[in-house]
Structure formats: C-alpha cells, structure tokens
Regions:
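Short amphipathic alpha-helix that is part of the acyltransferase structural core
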Residues: 1-29, 124
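Conserved catalytic-core motifs of GNAT/GCN5-like acyltransferases
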Residues: 103, 119-132
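Conserved beta-strand-loop-alpha-helix junction that forms the acyl-donor binding cleft
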Residues: 101-111
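Conserved acetyl-CoA-binding loop-helix of GNAT-fold acetyltransferases
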Residues: 74-90
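Conserved acetyl-CoA binding element of GNAT-fold acetyltransferases
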Residues: 59-76, 126
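Conserved beta-strand in the GNAT
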Residues: 40, 46-55, 61-64
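Conserved active-site tyrosine of GNAT-family acetyltransferases
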Residues: 111-118
Length: 132
C-alpha cells in the first residue's frame, strides 16, 4: 500500500501521547503547547510519523514535535519521515512561507533533514521553555 499524509485531528492527540511516552527521555507536550496545524503520515490507516507546525506573523514557520509510532517497523519508515517533511515544505511554500525552523535531537532525523537540503547549525542551542 501507499503512504498517505493528512492533517492532524484533535482525536489524534491521544495516539501521539502514547508514542511520546514510549520513547525514552521524551514526555508528551501538553495540548495547550501545540498549535492547531499538524500532519501525520499513514499506511493502511496506521499512523507512522507526525509533526506540528507553528505559524508565525512573519514568513516563517516552525516544524516541531516530530514523533513516530514505535511499533511501526516496516522498511518504508524512513520514506514516511521524508514524505512528512517534504509535504509540509510544499504546503508551507504554497502559503507563502519562506523559512522553516525545526528543533531536532535524534541523529537519524537530523540526517534526513540534511539530506533534504536543510541547513544544520553546527553549534546546537538549547530549547528553553517557561510555563506560566
């Protein structure tokens, strides 16, 4: 079967929380931290990988909170990640976005971004958040 991508729905959050909780060192972000826009790649109605997109008041978007289904181990997993990134790029480009930021920890995800032409800062910065 073919990989498909669709917009995230509110009902997907519970599934994504299970994925985040499975991965060591990760904690699901609270729903109040997430934007309304996001995408998920599926095959045969099984979610593989998803991400959220924050829109800004400039020509910039933030591609973040990438998480994958830990139980999905088929050979097209990397292709699903590539599809997620490339489809998001296309949607954002069509909306007039000129720049996309992403925050990446996992070395394989970083490599996929690099292979797709993203500029990788060689001096990583820290993610800082304050809950009010």
């Amino acid at each position: 079967m073919e990989l498909n991508i669709r917009r995230l729905e509110e009902s997907d959050y519970e599934t994504l929380v299970k994925w985040w909780d499975w991965w060591p060192g990760w904690e699901a972000p609270p729903k109040t931290l997430l934007p309304d826009t996001g995408f998920i790649v599926e095959k045969n109605n099984v979610g593989i990988v998803s991400a959220y997109v924050y829109m800004t008041n400039s020509k910039t978007a933030i591609f973040d909170w990438v998480v994958s289904n830990p139980e999905y181990r088929e050979s097209d997993r990397k292709n699903a990640i590539r599809l997620l990134i490339q489809a998001t790029e296309t949607v954002l480009r069509d909306q007039g976005i000129k720049h996309i930021f992403s925050f990446v920890r996992h070395k394989n995800l970083l490599k996929i971004h690099e292979d797709l032409g993203w500029d990788i800062d060689k001096k990583p910065s820290h993610e800082i958040i304050k809950n009010l």
